[in-house]
């Protein structure tokens, strides 16, 4: 079987690329190991909602059209949205077709699947950045009788063993799950590492409205001094609750969650924690306030004072004067450790020498290094700060599909340009933001 381009993955990134390839009359196929939006259907917990408001679900040729633009979609609603998008754009998706190998050929690539082999000149890796839970090696040292659970396995508190829960990690996933489990009646201890605090609503508007309008989400990969760090920053402490409330360490301690420092070691059934909790929360508060300062400056420059509320600042994060540095898990009644320690992609099937020592694809803005015709989509800060979001897939797909068209046309592709000029929309202020 042949196609000019093979797109691996039928999530939002793969579907956005499909639409953009079709607009350029580039024949292609989208290969999906499960169903459209498969990860959203099978690898998320029951109560999870998108962290971005509904109006921000913008894909090429499609967007939100309901009556609740400021709400947050459930996973079922997200899946239905993406399934409908695939239908509207008539994406050539082959479901239940698992890619088992991608190999380089003289004239392109061989893509082996569970349903035969495809030959193509172009391969777009859009299989996602969250294929495997990044559970640290320390998990192997957990004492017997204590369950080890990743967010991909977690569904709801009732499915956990009765007793206390140690949640490791305090970014968006960690704080949401800690909040839910604590409210279920199971006592939670939260091990806090690097995190970025942010209010859900600021000056009467969703924080994503501010970041979108001020151009923060449009910061580009070629404008960032340390792109590797930017791609590995933790997600903002946000949740898509229907009541639009914020979730942060203060809201968690208010309902009884105990805070400890970063989990550093596990010895003889005792968890050992870093003594740097105070520094971590102070740095997180500093980053939040720096973000709010930038937003305020942008609002003032745009004369938005009459449209939004007054500037706000939030109480510093509260922690105990002497947080516990060690915890005997059995004596403390801990029965489950939940590892909210991030995710990583799975490229075990990619048999092309383009991975670095940590298993990441080496790329420049989504154009894979040293393998012409190979492209990447859907990872954090691929081309913009918003690249991993549903809202970020469109701009990236437009630019990379233009690069693909030039490549196929025999031209030497230049660096993909900016499909949407942000400066005339947000001004230079938004492009110089020193964001954490």
Which residues are covered by each model-predicted region?
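Flavin (primarily FAD) cofactor-binding/catalytic cores of flavoenzymes
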Residues: 1-42, 72-425, 433-436
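N-terminal glycine-rich dinucleotide-binding loop that anchors FAD/FMN and/or NAD(P) in oxidoreductases
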Residues: 44-67, 208-223
